[in-house]
Design a protein with these regions (language model features):
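Glycine/serine-rich anion-binding loops at beta->alpha junctions
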Residues: 95-111, 197
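Acyl-CoA/ACP chain-elongation machinery
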Residues: 90, 136, 196
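Acidic-glycine-rich active-site phosphate/pyrophosphate-binding loop
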Residues: 77-92, 163, 180-190, 312
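Acidic/His- and Gly-rich active-site-bordering loop/insert found
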Residues: 1-98, 121-126
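Residue-level recognition of beta-strand->loop/alpha-helix junctions
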Residues: 43, 133, 292-294
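Short beta-strand segments
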Residues: 69-71, 132-134, 162-166, 190-192, ...
């Protein structure tokens, strides 16, 4: 049997701080090639962005096709001297594996790799199993999963269902399965006035006043009341600034940044219209500009045979899974355009923290859940796949 702990240790020992590959995908590639997978390494780049390593590995052919998606890049470890165990040593202590990426999400990659190696050791699947792994999830997410999906489609790959190994669990492995995510829309609102002395406000035009009124217009009334699957959409102002450090100067310009996490009652286009309508009414003639960042759309994988199969695989481990759409975004936001997708991974309590770790028992539990999914998947979807 494949040793999930050894695989996780090997991955953690690769210093793959985003966007560096650090040897993690090279290790995974060698591991899967030895098991009979066809492995393709792809690098993508774009102006002003770092070049990123990506990996696609596949065994079997035809349909149904189950894809596991994940990322080998990790966030920086911070002050390494603050760690009780070095962040890239993969040390084990008190029944836990320590290291950057243990929870998010090298542990889950190791679990699916171990499950897939055990499953395919008995013969190729009646369909296909693949890995879609990027080094650009913790970064801008421009040269990673999105482009790898485009590349896979161009070569004729068709995915039927996907699992993303993000750390979704709250207390016990498998207790939470993400079947959707809220969309995310960020923007910068700039309001223009006229600089002047605070003692002579009649000679100036303070942009802070209309800015405050416009922010109140965005926040005082909810965008919706939520849905059965999603909590209500929410806007948070994240910064307000004028570039002015003096107490006696009225600034010429004031800016605010905000983010909206929105449910499936909206898409980014409809939400922009609502935002702009509120701002126009509150501005009362003030000059302003609104600049958006690239949005992420919301999505929902509705309950059906695939979600039920994943829920039953978790139940076999003695855990009742809750279906959730809470939390932040993941690369599932790209995959949902190709096939139904769920997020299922380890407990994420220590992700991105000093001394990030995962219990060894949790790695074993997740491996067993993934293996059950593989064991049931091809019989369940062999007829329904087209």
């Amino acid at each position: 049997m494949a040793n999930v702990v050894e695989i996780a240790q090997a991955l953690i020992r690769c210093r793959s701080v985003t966007p560096a590959e650090g040897g993690a995908q090279r290790y995974l590639s060698d591991l899967l090639i030895r098991a009979g997978f066809d492995v393709q390494r792809q690098k993508f780049s774009s102006p002003g962005m770092p070049e990123v390593d990506n990996l696609f590995a596949k065994i079997g052919a035809g349909r149904p096709h189950l894809v596991f998606a994940g990322h080998t890049d990790v966030v920086p470890p911070g002050n390494e001297s603050s760690w009780c165990h070095p962040p890239f040593a993969g040390e084990i202590a008190d029944g836990k594996l320590f290291g950057r990426g243990a929870a998010d999400m090298k542990g889950a990659i190791a679990a699916f790799a171990a499950a897939a190696l055990d499953f395919t050791a008995r013969g190729k699947p009646r369909g296909a199993v693949s890995f879609l792994v990027t080094g650009d999830e913790e970064g801008p997410a421009v040269n990673g999963t999105l482009k790898l999906l485009h590349w896979a489609k161009a070569r004729g790959e068709k995915f039927d269902h996907a699992i993303v190994g993000e750390p979704t669990s709250v207390k016990r492995v498998g207790d939470t399965i993400k079947i959707g995510r809220r969309g995310s829309l960020s923007a910068t609102l700039s309001v223009f006035g006229k600089q002047g002395h605070v003692a002579y406000p009649d000679r100036a035009q303070n942009p802070m006043r209309p800015l405050i009124a416009m922010l109140e217009a965005l926040t005082e009334k909810p965008f919706d009341s939520g849905t059965k699957e999603f909590q209500r959409s929410n806007l948070e102002v994240t910064s307000v600034e004028s570039g002015n450090s003096a107490f006696n100067v009225i600034p010429a310009e004031a800016k605010a940044r905000f983010n909206v996490r929105f449910n499936d009652k909206h898409n980014s286009a409809s939400l922009k219209k609502t935002i702009e309508k509120r701002l126009k009414a509150a501005a009362k003639g003030a000059r302003y500009r609104l600049d958006y960042e690239p949005p992420s759309e919301s999505y929902l994988t509705r309950r059906g045979p695939f979600v039920d199969l994943v829920v039953k695989a978790v139940a076999a481990s003695g855990v009742k899974a809750a279906l959730s759409t809470s939390g932040g975004t993941s690369d599932a936001r790209f995959i949902k355009n190709y096939c139904p997708v769920v997020d299922l991974g380890l407990v994420g309590n220590t992700m991105h923290q000093i001394d990030e770790h995962v219990p060894l028992e949790d790695l074993q539990r997740l491996t067993k859940i993934y293996r059950r999914i593989l064991e049931k998947y091809f019989a369940a979807f062999a007829v329904s796949a087209r």
